[in-house]
Amino acid sequence: MGVASPLPNTYSAFFGDAAPPTVAAAVADRPLVSPCQSSASNGRRMAKICSISLLVVLSLSILNASASGEQQKKVRQKREWIIPPRKLRENVNYMYLDYIAKIRSDEETRTSIRYSLKGAGADQPPRDLFTVGSTDGKVKINGLLDREKTPVYYLQGVAKFLNGSNAEKDVDLRVVVLDENDCPPVFNLTIGAVSELSARDTLVMSITATDADEEGTLHTKIAYSIVEQSHAEMFYINRETGGIYVMHNTLDREKIDSYTLTVKGTDMNGAPGGNSGTGKVVINILDVNDNVPTLEKNIYECRVEENTRFVEVVRIQAIDADLIYTDNWLAVFTLVSGNEAGYFSITTDKKTNEGILMLNKELDYEELKEIRLQVSVSNKAHYHSSVVITGSKTYTIQVSVINQPEAPRFKPAVKVITISEESTTVILNKVITNYAAIDSDTMLIATNVRYAKGQDVDNWLIIDEKTADIRLNKIPDYESVFLKNYTYYAHILCITNETPAKTATGTIAIQVKDFNDHCPVLIHQSQKLCYEEHVVFVTAEDKDHFPNAHPFGFKVNTKHTKESWSVEHFNDTAAIFRSQETLWPGVYHLSVDVWDQQGKVCGAQLLRVEVCMCGAEKVCLPVTVVSRFGGSGVLLMLLGLLLLLLIPLLLLFCLCGAAGAAGDFKAIPFDAKEHLIAYNTEGQGEDKGMALLHMSKDENTRTNVGTVGGAQKQSDGKDGAVTAGGSHWSTFYHYDQFNNNAYHHHRDRTDGDFMYAQRKDEHSRFENYNAFDGLALSDAFLGNYYSQKSSHVAQKQALGDNLKVYEYEGQESRAGSFEDICSLMHEEEDLAFLDNLDMKFKTLAEICSGSTIQRESINVSSKKTESKDLSVQETSNILQSQEKKSSTILAGSVNQSSNMQQTSQEKKTSTIIAGSINQSSSLQHASTGVYLQEQVMLPNTTLLVQQPALYYAPAAPVYVVEPHPTVLVASGQVLGHQENQKRPKNAKHETHYQSLVYVEQQQPLRESQGSISGAVHMVNTEIMQSTEGHGVRREIRPARRVMMEEVREREVDSLHLRVPMSL
C-alpha cells in the first residue's frame, strides 16, 4: 500500500517530485513502468522515440523542481510507500482541493478495499479535520490549520478488506504545518527599581516579549522601543536586547518615587508589515540617605524633681525626608555636653523617631539647680556620597531641678574609726564616736529622728537611739573573719518620726590595728623521716600580721628532748632540724620553742618525728603487721580442745538406736499430723470409661521390685503362673484377694492410673541423677533416721481402721467371699490397740495411773553376711502385641534357668531390725534420693526371723534377700509386707507373707530378662494396702489361710518393668 500525491505514481517513483500538472494529467492512469521498458518488438525505431520521450520528461522535471518543492517525495519499497513529511501552511484554505494526499493498496487491483484514517485530527480530537475516501483513498482537509496549536499531525492510513481484515500494513502519514507571521509580540507587566541619584547609563532592568510564531525565524525576532514615559524622559531602551537604562542622574525619590513606561515590540525585526505589541513597565526609585535629620526646635526647656531617677524628662521629635521606618530615616541622638556626671541618657523611639531624655541619677537641688545639655542628631545609615556635611549642628535642652522636702542624711556617708585590738586600750561601753544625720535643707543636725543599727554581723556596736553615740560591744579582733581588708563595716539608720517615715543610711568603718596577741605555732605536729636521713623541715605560722608575725625563731628544748638536734635557718617561716646521729626506725618526740619577730613565745611545742624505712621515692614503706599468738589465744585453743573432749562424754548419756529412741523420735514435718484414729473412705464411684496407657518396652529402664519369702521356680521366659507380682519402679503395691478382687480393680482404674503416671514421671527424671545426687546428710544418720521413721509409720498405720472391701458391680468379675469383711467388722470395735500406745501418751498414762511407766526396748543383734544381688526383668501385659510376662523375687530357695548368668558377688553388711518395717514411700520425688521413714513402738510379742542381708542406697528402694530356705516366726502378731500387682489372663495369684527388709545403697548391677513362677509358702502374717487420696496405706493383720486360686484377667495399663538381678 502506498500514499500518493496528486501526481502520478510513475513520476513520483522515478523522480521523487511531482510532475507538472499537464504531465500528471496525461499519465495519471498509466501503470508504474518506464517507456523504456516497452516490449522489444518495437525495434530500433521505437528506441529512438523512447529516448526522445525520456529527455523531454527529464527536462520538464528539472525545470519544475522548484515549483514542486512542497510536494512530498515518495519511494516505493515493495508494496508500501514511505512518504516524507507533507507541509501545509497554516491559515490557508485547502478545502477546495479534491485531495491533499492519496493512499492506495496494490490489493485493490484484485478486490475491493476500504480506506480509513486514524490519529489526532482524524478519529481523535480534533476529529474529522482530515478525512479519506473509503474507496478511492483520497485524503482531504476540512478546516484551517493553526501551527501554534498543532505544528505536526501524525496520521495512519488503514486499508481493509470487506470482511474487516487488514489488507495492508498501516502506513504513516505526517502532515507538517508551516508557520505564518500571524502572532504579535506579548508583554507581561514588569516592575523594576533603581536608586535615586543613580549615574547615567545605569542598567535598570531588561524586558522580554514573547511571540507564539515559530522560533528562530523573523516571525519571532522582536525590536523594542519606548512609546511613552509618565514623567520627563529619564530612561531609554536598547532596541535589540530590551534593556532599560538611566538617561539622567537627577532621579530624586523625594520628588518622584516611581516611573511608568509604555514599551513596544515589533516582530520581523521591526520591518514594515511586522506585527507589534505594547506593554507597561513600572520603575520604582529606591531611597538613599541624602537628607540630614533636623529637630523641630532649637531650644527645649523641661523640669525634673530632685531625688528622683529613672523618669522621662522630655521627648524631642526628629524630622527626616528619607523613606520612613528605614535606617535612612531613623535618628540617632547624642548628648554632646552638660552630662559629664552621667545624670541623663537619651534613646530613640523607633516608631515615632523621637528622642527620649531619661534621668538616671538623683539630683540634689541644694547642689545643682539647673543643667544645660547640648544634643546632636544624625541617621543610623551612612549619608550618601552626594551629601556634604561641614559641621554637626547642636540643639539645647534646659533642665530645671525642683526642690523637694528631703529626708535627713549622713555626712559623710562612710565614717572611718581606727581602734586597736589590744584589750588594755579598749574600754567597752565607752563612746567612740557620734554619727548623727543632718537635715538636707538646712544642713544642720537633724531633729525629730531616731537611730538604729541596720547591719552589724558580729554585733560589735551599740548606738544611742536619740543621740547617735556609738559604743563598742566587744573587743575588736584583727583576725576576725568578718573583716574586709582589716576593716569592719556596720550600717546605721536614721528614721524620721513623721508619716510616712523617711530613712537615711550611713556606714561605720572600723579599721582594726593589729596587736601581737597570737603566738606562732607549728603547722605540722608530726613529721616523717626516712631511715639514715637527718633533716626535718619545720614550719610555723602566726595569725598576727607584720610586724607581729614572721620571721620566726626556732630552738630545740634539750631538757625535754632525748636526742641531739641542731637548728638551721631556712626562711622566715621554716627551719631545718638536723639530727646529730642516725636514728633507728621508730617514733621520737622533740620539744620546740618558736617565737615571732617581737620575741613572743607561748611555751614549748611537741613535734613528733617518725623514722621509717623508705623506698626509692623517699616515701615510707607500708608496715607489715605481724600477728603473734598471745596468751589469750592459747587459752581459747585449750578451751576448744576441752569442748571437743566433752562432746563424746555427753553423747554417752544420749539414747541411740531405733528401739531406744523410738519414743523420742521427732519426724521431719513434711506431712500434716494425723489424729489418733483415721477413718477409711469408701471406694470411688463407678467409672465406666478408662483409657489404657501404653508404655513401650525399654530395656534400659530401671525398675525396683520388692521381694517376699517363699519358694519359686524361674521359667524359660514364656507365659506361666505368677506367684507374686512386682511393682513398677516404686513401692506401690496392690493387695489382691479373692474376696476383694473387684474392688481393687476399681481402685486401680482410678487412683492407679494417676499413681502410675506420677511414677513414670519420677522414673524419667530419676534417670538423670546419680546415686548420691541431692544427698546432703551422712549415710549413718540417714540410715538411723529411716529406720526410726519406718517404725513410726508402721505403728501409726496399725492404729487405724482396716479397709473394707466391697464388690464393684460394674466389673464382670466373679463375686468374692465376704468372710473377711465380716471379720473386719468385728475388728473395728476392737480397742485393744489402746493397750499398746505410742510413747507420746506416756505422760498421760503416768498422770492417770499415778505411777511411772517403764519403757521396754528390744536389743537387736546383727552380723555380717554375704549376699548375692538378684535382678529379674519383668514385662507385664503388653496389649495384643507383647508377650505377657511378670516376675517377682522371693526370699527363699531360687532355681534359676540357663539364660540367667551370674554377674558379680559382693560382700555386704546387713542388719535386720526385729519387728520393724522399713518401707520406702512411693510418693517421694525421685530426684532427691531420700525417703523419710517414721518410727513405731514394737509390740510385746517376740519375733524370731532368720537374719537376711540389709543394704542402704539413696536411689529408689530395691528389696534383695539372700536365699535362705527357712523362715521361722514366733506366734503373735508380726509386721510384714505384701506386694500385689495386676496380672495377665490365666495367671496364678498367691499371697506371700514375710518380714520386710529395707535395702539402701544398692550398687548398679547387670540386667537379665526372665519370668519366674513357682509356689509360695504362707506364714502367719498378711499385709493389705490401699490407696487413699493418691497416698499409700497399709494394714497388717493375722493371716487365716493360704489363698491359691485363679485370678481373673484385668484390663490394666501396659507396663514395662525392669528389676535388677544379680546372680
Curated annotation (Swiss-Prot):
Domain (Cadherin): residue spans on this chain: 106-187, 194-295, 296-410, 411-522
Keyword Cell division applies: no
Entry keyword Calcium: yes
Extracellular side: 1-632
Gene Ontology biological process: cell-cell adhesion; cell-cell junction organization; homophilic cell adhesion via plasma membrane adhesion molecules; morphogenesis of an epithelium
Places the protein is found: Cell junction, Desmosome; Cell membrane
Residues on Cytoplasmic side: 654-1063
SUPFAM superfamilies documented for this protein: Cadherin-like
Record-level GO cellular component terms: desmosome; plasma membrane
Topology class, membrane: Multi-pass membrane protein
Keyword set, alphabetical order: Calcium, Cell adhesion, Cell junction, Cell membrane, Glycoprotein, Membrane, Metal-binding, Repeat, Transmembrane, Transmembrane helix
GO molecular function: calcium ion binding
Glycan attachment points: N163, N188, N485, N571
Residue spans crossing the bilayer: 633-653
Main location: other
Function: A component of desmosome cell-cell junctions which are required for positive regulation of cellular adhesion. Involved in the interaction of plaque proteins and intermediate filaments mediating cell-cell adhesion.
Xref: PANTHER family: DESMOGLEIN FAMILY MEMBER, DESMOGLEIN-2
Record's comment describing the protein's domains: Three calcium ions are usually bound at the interface of each cadherin domain and rigidify the connections, imparting a strong curvature to the full-length ectodomain.
Name of the protein in question: Desmoglein-2-like protein
Annotated organism of origin: Danio rerio (Zebrafish)
